Amino acid sequence: MSIFKNKNVLITGAAGICGQSAVSRMLSEEANVRAVVYNRRTSEFEHDNLEVVKADLSLYDDCVNVIKDIDIVLHFAAHIRGAQGQQEEQVALVTKNVVPSVNMLDVSVNNNVEYFGFINSSTAYPDVSYPVKETEMFDGNPFVGYTGVGWMKRYLQKVIEYFQTLNKTKFGVVVPMAVYGPRDNFNHYGHAIPQLIMKASDGMNPFEIWGYGSQVIQFIYVDDLIDSLLYVLEKDPSGIPYNVGTGVSTTITELVETITEIYDYQPKFNYDTTKPSMITKRELDVTKITDLGWKPKHDLRSGLEKTINWYEDNK
């Protein structure tokens, strides 16, 4: 039997890309879901087993209120930005993430929740050999462009590992690279895929690509990311991180080629090297999660097709 069936599950960041995917999945698992939103659109789902509440998780009292009667926490509330936003909001990316996360960890442990699921970030890894393993997280400083957010994510990882030793709460942690899918931030602050999809949808030609197009990234479809987190919570809720993804690397130029192929046009590419771009190469070693028995259901193209279909239906 699923560990989620008939359990009271709290999902923070429920209006975001990961949160909405998790809400849908938990309802299918027959859980009783309390979805926490802040100031974005509320969850699009309506269900007898779904309660949507508004809360500011930077306020400890709000965290105390939402944790009541909860068995499992899936914590996705986060302040996230793409390449340009990471340069513009370096302080906010630390403070607006660490305070709500520590608050939720604190109230979860103090209320003896059974499981706590957390998505960490590959920005915590140093710029070392690739593909990078989980054991290498502290083998050097984070990439200079990720210094603030990288150390913040490392801190949260250590807090989780410490809290794992305190009481019965069990922690599941996964580390993806570039998450994409329906309900992403399709705006100025979004990550690469939403911005590229918007350009392709508008028929941009020549097609503007930030940087040289040679940056190497691994992408993971959001439903696969949520599935991996739930899998780790069931199989090894030890607080130790698991890298997750397809294990397939893609350059930004290859990504744009795939997106424009789906839109059935062939624009010329214009590489704007004056625009912000981040680390030139980042690959995760996914051997550990593979050995645990998990693998993703979507390759990049099938995930992009689902994402583009959703965007065209909802823009």
Predicted regions and their residues:
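N-terminal Rossmann NAD(P)H-binding glycine-rich loop of SDR-like oxidoreductase domains
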Residues: 7-29
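SDR active-site strand-loop-helix element
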Residues: 12, 36, 73-79, 116-122, ...
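Conserved glycine-rich Rossmann-like NAD(P)H-binding loop of the short-chain dehydrogenase/reductase
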Residues: 31-40
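NAD(P)H-binding glycine-rich loop region in Rossmannoid oxidoreductase-like domains
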Residues: 54-96, 110
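Conserved Rossmann-fold NAD(P)-dependent oxidoreductase catalytic core, especially the SDR/UDP-sugar
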Residues: 75, 102-146, 172
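Short alpha-helix in the Rossmann-fold core of NAD(P)-dependent oxidoreductases
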Residues: 93-101, 117, 152-153
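NAD(P)-dependent short-chain dehydrogenase/reductase
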Residues: 128-131, 154, 159-234, 247-249, ...
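C-terminal substrate-binding subdomain of Rossmann-fold SDR/epimerase-dehydratase oxidoreductases
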Residues: 202-315
